[in-house]
């Protein structure tokens, strides 16, 4: 009876933490942030936040970007977004299609939660009205109130093993993005896959940093420092925690070595690898 009661309390605590995470994300979006989670939200689409992560030249080509909310003055910024993607590709010496003759297909992965309904609706309305321009997906990311580095190793291993049942479910999302870039069926139209939150810093950084650790050899510190450079500040604690949970998932569940999840924020000069 005592054991079952403790298990019940533990599961109830997890549910409370998950609910608080969603509520805190809602508070941030509504107020512009607090002392615990303080992103610079919104604003128009920023060239600084548009970054090329991956390119696959098979077929008509597939590009992967991270961005902030792809809107200007409350409207979906299609032309601006594509022009920023083109310029980032040129900077990386990566080919880019002739937009006039070939056009592009956008695959928009929004990381926003339901509390950002109006921003989600901007994107949904655009793609519903312009189905030839691409497709929209919504995969809400909230991060974690708890850092895995606060836990004992035994507890951390247990929590990490259940990561695919978390709200974010990065063990499912990150490979899905990778598989979309390296599809067995090369696209017949140039395809621009991109993911974003509001500011393109915190939740976007959590996903982007996780992707770079899994597929581009970044350590936890390199992923964290790169995210901070894009954000032009430290990414939010909840997003740091989400990034670290995935770091430990790669370590315990996938056998990755030398990610150094525990020492990700120790001050030192590091070199961030060139992505492309």
Q: Residues of each region from the PLM?
A:
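Cys-dependent protein tyrosine phosphatase-like superfamily
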Residues: 2-10, 14, 26-194, 198-199, ...
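Sec-dependent signal peptide recognition
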Residues: 13-21
């Amino acid at each position: 009876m005592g054991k079952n009661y403790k298990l019940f309390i533990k599961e109830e605590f997890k549910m409370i933490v998950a609910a608080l995470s969603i509520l805190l994300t809602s508070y941030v979006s509504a107020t512009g942030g607090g002392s615990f989670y303080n992103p610079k939200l919104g604003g128009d689409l920023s060239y600084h936040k548009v970054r090329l992560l991956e390119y696959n030249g098979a077929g008509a080509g597939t590009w992967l970007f991270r961005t902030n909310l792809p809107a200007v003055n409350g409207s979906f910024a299609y032309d601006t977004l594509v022009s920023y993607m083109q310029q980032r590709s040129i900077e990386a010496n990566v080919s880019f299609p002739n937009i006039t003759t070939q056009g592009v297909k956008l695959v928009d992965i929004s990381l926003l939660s339901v509390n950002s309904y109006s921003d989600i609706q901007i994107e949904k309305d655009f793609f519903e009205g312009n189905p030839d321009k691409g497709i929209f997906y919504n995969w809400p990311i909230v991060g974690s109130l708890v850092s895995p580095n606060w836990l004992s190793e035994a507890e951390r291993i247990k929590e990490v093993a259940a990561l695919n049942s978390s709200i974010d479910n990065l063990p499912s999302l990150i490979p899905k993005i990778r598989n979309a870039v390296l599809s067995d069926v090369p696209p017949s139209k140039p395809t621009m896959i991109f993911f974003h939150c509001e500011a393109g810093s915190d939740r976007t950084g959590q996903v982007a940093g996780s992707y770079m650790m899994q597929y581009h050899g970044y350590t936890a510190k390199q992923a964290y420092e790169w995210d901070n450079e894009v954000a032009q500040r430290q990414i939010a604690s909840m997003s740091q925690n989400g990034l670290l949970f995935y770091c430990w998932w790669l370590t315990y569940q996938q056998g990755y070595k030398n990610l150094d999840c525990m020492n990700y924020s120790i001050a030192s000069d590091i070199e961030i690898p060139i992505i492309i």
